[in-house]
């Protein structure tokens, strides 16, 4: 009897761990989020009040593109191959505290890796950002095709020069950027239709 109870507790803990490290499979967007995700527009804006899930929506969509694991309800754009992407915010710290946290997990807790929108078992190599505690510069994510998607973290404060040069599939701008950064984001994805 005691062994059965201990085994049941172990199973419950493992199920909870799997749920926590695979948020992508459990995401149930509100109607306004689903409408945003299902738009096929090449440029989109999700404007809503504070603390209602805008950043979560951006992170979940980015995770779908990075992994190629789109839900059944998805009608938006799909990538059938690994992608190159950037996620950006106002500063290195806010990019870490919002974008990185929503995608990977709490930045200052190594045990939280994989508790963001990207499932733990699909996170590959991560590269730290120099000079910014607990911040990532980039990471790779296993795509369902077997290849690796690449995600870089950028900050508007870096200036437009740091946003130049790369050809990308997806750019997630978590807060309204300066016009020069927005222009660079458009240029990076210009040939992606």
Residue ranges and their predicted role:
Residues 1-193:
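Phosphate/NTP-binding elements of NTP-utilizing enzymes
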